[in-house]
Amino acid sequence: MPDLLLELRSEEIPARMQRRAAEDLKKLVTDALVERGFLYEGAKAFATPRRLALHVAGLPARGEAVREERRGPRVGAPEAAVQGFLKSAGLASLDQATTVTDPKKGEFYLAVIERPGRETLDVLAEILPGIIKSFPWPKSMRWGAASAQPGSLRWVRPLQSIVATFGPETETPEVVPFSVDGITAGMVTSGHRFLAPEPFEVRRFDDYVQALERADVILDADRRKDIILHDAKDLAFARGLDLVEDEGLLEEVAGLVERPVVLMGSFEERFLEIPAEAIRATIRANQKCFVLRKSGSDELAPAFVLVSNLIASDGGAAITAGNERVVRARLSDARFFWETDKATKLEDRLPKLDSIVFHEKLGTQGERVARIAALAAEIAPLVAADPALAERAARLAKADLVTEMVGEFPELQGLMGRKYAALQGEHDSVAAAIEEHYKPVGPSDRVPTDPVSIAVALADKLDTLVGFWAIDEKPTGSKDPYALRRAALGVIRAVIERSLRLSLASLLKGRFVSGSDERTADLLAFFADRLKVYLRDQGARHDLIDAVFALPGQDDLLMVVRRVEALGAFLATDDGKNLLAGYKRAANILRIEEKKDGRAYDEAPDAALAASGQPEERALAEALAAARQEASAAVAAEDFAGAMRALSRLRAPVDAFFEKVTVNADDPALRKNRLLLLNALRAATREVADFSRIEG
């Protein structure tokens, strides 16, 4: 079956945009084909610094004919409805429609629309120009004489050529006939910008890939990454060194070269006095190079790996020397930052925080630090931390924001603060908290273990959440510019993974200047939503989470989790499943009878009347009283498994009651009391969760 080959060659595409652009191209083209009824066997997109490419395999040469019956308005309908029908169906008059009789709805018009199958080549020529002209680049530009025209082509960098061919493997493919702003699709492309700039012709995908390889272009980004990684490791191994792997940098560098050539440079040992993280940040950020460490050690080596886009005649000596000069200059700057920063204590830097605006509505970093310090001291006893150390750590936590090193490399905030604090004789826990209070910064990041770090981390995140809730800057949909979901998840993970007992409502009380109760309740609801997401990711059932959160006062996240776990384990047993079924039956009966009677059956049942009734009625009343008391005591003791065991003993009497007892008895008093017994079952289960929220 025929294949499509599409290449869009331009000047350099920023590395960070390449993968997304390739996937966008694939989705836009394949979606447009499927929308028009053209299915395909497979599609794969590619990106290099100078081209996007797409291969769609197994397309039909021609689309199938389509016959559609479109129902119109009733015969005799208003003229406007008839004209709308004719227009939508592409008919000139009602003479071109047929009339169909429906036994229930009468006569109505029917249009039979037949569309002959179209040539795939024609369809491609129709859809590709629009996709190219409306391509969703994050940033784009216009260029040349055409840029003055309204609606002219926008591309990430000037588009230079388009390859678009279509045809089967056994025949010469055809060029898809279209052009965009004077660039006409053809079969001609070119290779590496410096190594093989001459144009050459390509026909189909296999030829295209091989021709690019001969022209020093490796089309597949993953293959470029693999070459870089393995060559870098081999080069390091040959020198007795290990590569410090960096997936983000590897992805970026693979997007900077079409023909990767791995080289190694070096710098003077004296620069190793700088913290390893600063060396790595300097070499990574400024030169896009990988650092190396001594084999079998965490200690950095005075060497680095660089990736060139050229096969140099001198073996890369000049390229390496040029990179070494720049790296030395950058490391000299980093060394100056390091020495300059060490000369000033973190505490002496605090006044500068008063001139840094955190948010225009939330004051300065200095004001924020004061709030975090007070909250950290309050949280400290709850997490077994020293309040004085927690307050001290919070006071210094943001001081490194005004250091030279963090000013140059913001990604080192916290880490450099820890190093400066340690050099200045601060307590180990204080120094650790300065770095760790930002954690966790992502789902794979670890939660702090030191109690002081935990106290400051919680205070920092809670202050952030309270502040943005106070000014009504909450996350909406997919937008979360201040990473408030991440902050809430950080609090949740710290509480759960470190088994912390905290009442969020108590910690939030009085934090809001106005509307305290409403804002606190709204923020607690946000925590509940985030906890649901977290627990779902851990495999918990969403309905069980809802069932626990439906109970009042659920602001102790650790207890919520333990209750959900116990409830899940209970409902996985036969006793749990049968009790849930019994609950559902009781709740359904109550709902029907309460609606019919216009009243709620929510008082306690008459024990004497139940005792004088049928044996199963008496047994259920006794079991409910005992189970509710036992479950309540177990919940109070935080023994949720024990509470579930208490409920499990209701299974047999509930089953027997429904089997032998008629709830809607003729005697009104007896009927009422039996409905109250069912309400007692509802109340007993509510000791542990709202069973009405549980599916099944």
Swiss-Prot record:
It is an enzyme of class 6 (ligase). It catalyses: tRNA(Gly) + glycine + ATP = glycyl-tRNA(Gly) + AMP + diphosphate. Disulfide bonds: none annotated. GO terms for biological process: arginyl-tRNA aminoacylation; glycyl-tRNA aminoacylation. InterPro entries: DALR_anticod-bd, Gly-tRNA-synth_bsu, Gly-tRNA-synth_heterodimer. One of its GO terms (cellular component) is cytosol. GO terms for molecular function: arginine-tRNA ligase activity; ATP binding; glycine-tRNA ligase activity. The keyword Nucleotide-binding applies. SUPFAM superfamilies: HD-domain/PDEase-like. The keyword Kinase does not apply. It holds the Pfam family DALR_1. Keywords: Aminoacyl-tRNA synthetase, ATP-binding, Cytoplasm, Ligase, Nucleotide-binding, Protein biosynthesis. It is found in: Cytoplasm. It comes from the Bacteria. Its EC number is 6.1.1.14. NCBIfam families: glyS (TIGR00211). Belongs to the class-II aminoacyl-tRNA synthetase family. Tetramer of two alpha and two beta subunits. This is Glycine--tRNA ligase beta subunit. It comes from Methylorubrum extorquens (strain CM4 / NCIMB 13688). The gene is glyS.
